Design a protein with these regions (language model features):
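A structural signal for short, well-ordered beta-strand segments and their strand-loop junctions
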Residues: 82-85, 150-152, 205-210
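A short acidic, glycine-rich active-site loop
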Residues: 173-189
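Soluble or luminal CAZymes and related metallo-dependent hydrolases
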Residues: 61-65, 185-190
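Interdomain/boundary linker segments immediately adjacent to catalytic/signaling cores
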Residues: 1-110
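Non-catalytic C-terminal interaction segments of nucleic acid-processing enzymes
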Residues: 1-41, 139, 192-302
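Catalytic micro-motifs at enzyme active sites that drive phosphoryl/nucleotidyl and oxygen chemistry
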Residues: 103-111, 135-141, 194-197
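Short catalytic/ligand-binding loop motif for oxyanion handling, primarily in non-cytosolic enzymes
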Residues: 91-92, 129, 158-162, 214-220
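Conserved catalytic cores of phosphodiester-cleaving nucleases, focusing on short active-site segments
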Residues: 69, 73, 117-177
């Protein structure tokens, strides 16, 4: 397995004029169409003041998905790599002491250097900590430049295989259906901060969508290419789960099946009590075993 192609970022950079044109044609705001360099400072940053059950459940889902994917690489017999946590893993919730300071620090880092992905994959034998999140941004980014790829991990409450099987049967039965497959979801506003990270670190990146039965992934280059070519392989929607923000939707079948769960996760209930006495209960996925598709991972590396 070789280190990523040195012209990876250059190839994405060449797509940007067409990306901007496509997004502008779809009515995306000008502020989301400025790629490269540090972003402008926001005049006012709204800081979350309270974390409720839905936020806590979503964070628990994300933590589980990231852990399941990391474990699949560590237990793979066909791929020898090192893997490290790299993205922001702040355990503080809105309203807790220290949250405001950490939130503002993370926003400023992202503005200057881009949004860092959750995991980094390194060639076997690379001497690297298993968790880079405690390092300074500069130190962590130095390690990122040695990586094969970064992986942004997304979670879903669906079983992808079951979803697609039901939709196929609906089509046979001529039942109306709006979407035949789940989608990779990328907020339009995230494109420029993903691009900024690529610009700073010059390491390729993937998006991985972890379901309760499988995991699918796509290279970020392909995401930019779909947008640049205005391909029919993507749409822009404003789903409620994304706070009605413009979101790029690409069918997971346009990517690669990165893994399948041989053991399904279980679920536990966790409870958090706020300082004012409000009790929030939420579900946390636990365990499960994701078996990595080694050939799919190799295909995803450009």
């Amino acid at each position: 397995m070789s280190i990523h192609s040195p012209d990876y970022f250059t190839r994405i950079k060449e797509l940007i004029p067409a990306v901007i044109q496509t997004l502008a044609n779809k009515g995306i705001e000008e502020k989301h169409l400025q790629f490269g360099g540090e972003a402008e400072k926001e005049p006012k940053i709204s800081i979350p003041t309270d974390a409720r059950s839905e936020f806590l459940a979503n964070r628990a889902m994300g933590d589980w998905a990231e852990g399941a994917l990391k474990e699949s690489f560590m237990s793979s017999n066909g791929i020898a790599v090192e893997i490290s946590h790299y993205g922001d893993t702040d355990s503080l919730a809105a309203g807790e002491p220290g949250f405001k300071e950490n939130y503002l620090r993370a926003k400023e880092e992202t503005r200057r250097w881009g949004k860092r992905p959750d995991l980094l994959i390194f060639p076997a034998g690379t001497v690297v900590p298993s968790d880079l999140t405690a390092l300074s941004r500069e130190e962590a980014d130095d390690f990122a430049r040695l990586a094969l790829a970064g992986i942004e991990v997304r979670s879903s409450k669906f079983k992808a295989d079951k979803y697609m099987a039901v939709k196929r049967q609906d089509k046979i039965d001529k039942k109306p259906s709006s979407r035949e497959t789940p989608s990779f979801t990328v907020k339009v506003e995230d494109l420029k901060i993903v691009y900024r990270w690529l610009e700073v670190v010059q390491t390729q990146q993937m998006y991985a969508q972890v379901f309760f039965d499988s995991c699918f992934a796509i290279n970020v280059y392909a995401i930019f290419e779909y947008v640049a070519t205005a391909s029919k392989g993507f749409t822009i929607e404003k789903p409620e789960k994304s706070q009605n923000k413009a979101t790029i939707m690409i069918p997971i079948t346009n990517g690669e099946r990165l893994g399948t769960f041989s053991v399904s996760p279980e679920f536990g209930v966790e409870v958090r009590e706020t300082r004012t006495g409000r009790v929030d209960a939420y579900v946390r996925p636990q365990g499960g075993q994701l078996v990595l598709e080694e050939e799919a991972f190799k295909k995803l590396l450009l």
